[in-house]
Structures are given as structure tokens and as C-alpha cells.
Amino acid sequence: MKRLAIILVSAVFLSGCAELFYQPQRAKEWPDLGVHIAVVSVPSEDGASVRRDFVIRSIRPQSPAAFGKIEPGDVLIALDDQRIDSVSTAVRIMQGKSRFDTLLVTVERAGETRQILISLANAEMRSDI
């Protein structure tokens, strides 16, 4: 009986201390470029296929995108030379970045491809999409 009491007291004590040892993993934060993107489906001229464009709808003032001269209406082509084929691709690339990194953004503007090097130094940090 004494042994059972010691086991129960130990179990209660350890379960109360579990919070001290268990630290839930914090959500990873990544820099926010400061753009809102619209995914636009564009049919080919013959109608046989559809491509998706990632059009920049708006830019948050004082964000890395604003300082980098990205403009609403630009079509996002690539981040760090990795072609953007989905929103999750863009998020994955940004999740690999940290504050003070730079980011090479490739956009199409008025039919012309432009590459813009952006500093993420003033980026707000985020942990969700």
C-alpha cells in the first residue's frame, strides 16, 4: 500500500511539473513582403489551356514591397529565381527568409520583365497566411 501511495504522489507531482518541461513549439515567423495577391486564370488564345497569374492587387505602405518600387498590377513571376506556380510556393520561399535578408523579386510590368532586389529589414514578421 505504501508503494502505491508513493507511486500516486509521484504521478501527481510529475503531471503538475509537466508544464515546466513541456514548451510547445512556437510558430515560426517570417518577413512579410507587404503585398496582396490576386490569382487570375488566363486562358490561352486558342482556349486549350489556362495559366494562373499572380497579380499584385495592393501594397502596404512602408513595407519592403513599397520601398522596392513594386506596383499594383505587377505580375509576380519569381522570388529568388524560383518560379511562382502557387501561393504556397511563395509562402514557402518567404518562410525561409529572416529579417535583414534580401529577396530578388521578378515581376512583369507592361509586358516587360523586371528584377527588383528588396531588403526585408523593415518587414513586419508574421506566422500565418
Each predicted region: which residue ranges?
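PDZ/PDZ-like peptide-tail recognition elements
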Residues: 18-54, 58, 96, 119, ...
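Terminal peptide-recognition signature
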Residues: 35, 56, 65, 73, ...
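Extracytoplasmic
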Residues: 30-34, 49-53, 71-72, 85, ...
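C-terminal motif of bacterial Sec signal peptides marking the signal peptidase cleavage site
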Residues: 14-16
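Positively charged n-region of N-terminal signal peptides that target proteins for export
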Residues: 1-4
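N-terminal post-signal-peptidase region of extra-cytosolic proteins
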Residues: 55-63, 85-93
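Conserved PDZ fold ligand-binding element
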Residues: 65-87
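PDZ-domain C-terminal substructure recognizer with occasional recognition of PDZ-binding tails
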Residues: 18, 77, 92-129
